[in-house]
């Protein structure tokens, strides 16, 4: 019975993953044009104040960032 339930859950997950649209996430530039881009929090990049971006190791291109500092699970970018 337990194996049957686990199998049903796994099959359901596979069906949902396969049903996902091929291109459901717009590029960063397309999001910016639509006004969907969220800004990061402020951070210190000694002695400057920058924008903290979580989960990436480089600053987003095309935004005029000229300096970056590594931060906890992300990067601090300074214009």
Swiss-Prot record:
Propeptide segment residues: 20-39
Keywords (A to Z) from UniProt: Antibiotic, Antimicrobial, Cleavage on pair of basic residues, Disulfide bond, Immunity, Innate immunity, Ion channel impairing toxin, Nematocyst, Neurotoxin, Secreted, Signal, Toxin
GO molecular function, one term: ion channel inhibitor activity
Disulfide bonds: 43-76, 45-69, 59-77
Organ and tissue specificity: Highly expressed by the mesenteries. Moderately expressed by the pharynx. Weakly expressed by the gonad and pedal disk. No expression in tentacle.
Function recorded in the entry: Peptide with both antimicrobial and neurotoxin activities. Cationic AMP with antibacterial activity against both Gram-positive bacteria (B.subtilis, MIC=11.49 ug/mL) and Gram-negative bacteria (E.coli (MIC=12.21 ug/mL) and S.enterica (MIC=11.95 ug/mL)). Shows no significant antimicrobial activity against bacteria S.aureus and P.aeruginosa, as well as the fungus C.albicans. In vivo, induces reversible paralytic activity towards the shrimp P.paucidens. May act by impairing sodium or potassium channels in the prey.
Descriptive protein name: Crassicorin-I
């Amino acid at each position: 019975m337990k194996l049957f339930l686990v199998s049903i859950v796994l099959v359901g997950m596979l069906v949902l993953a396969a049903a996902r649209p091929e291109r459901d996430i717009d590029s960063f530039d397309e999001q910016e044009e639509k006004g969907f881009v969220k800004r990061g929090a402020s951070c210190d990049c000694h002695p400057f104040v920058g924008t903290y971006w979580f989960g990436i190791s480089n600053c987003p291109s095309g935004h005029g960032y000229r300096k970056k500092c590594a931060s906890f699970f992300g990067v601090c970018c300074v214009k």
